[in-house]
């Protein structure tokens, strides 16, 4: 069974909610560092800070991550697969030392953030839609990593 119109709509609506509050980006990175403190050095905008400090770069990167997952949902619905819009993503992830467990941490942080953002609109169906879209994006990035 492919990615459904309803799943795409669920991802789109919660993506819009995510973008409305800059604090959601801070929450996302706070969850990542709670799960994997050593990952701090992988993000240029966190390396030299105490904790997670809000910044334009942090906002931009979080929006890029969530936006790419949202784009994956759109692609899954349209074509059944995900093609990376940025061919350098594989190389960047290799350069930063990203390995499989990091994808799991980011996925958990993404799902927790979406749950928080969605409030009473959260459901297992919503979580599954984000999970499927993230997994497809992660697979495309891993493929680009070789």
Swiss-Prot record:
Globin domain boundaries: 2-146
CDD domains, alphabetized: class1-2_nsHbs_Lbs
GO MF term set: heme binding; metal ion binding; oxygen binding; oxygen carrier activity
GO biological process: one example: response to cadmium ion
Chain positions found as Nitrated tyrosine: 29, 134
Keyword Iron included in the entry's annotation: yes
Family of the protein in this entry: Belongs to the plant globin family.
Matches recorded under PANTHER family: LEGHEMOGLOBIN-RELATED (PTHR22924), NON-SYMBIOTIC HEMOGLOBIN 2 (PTHR22924:SF92)
This protein's name: Leghemoglobin 1
Organism: Medicago truncatula
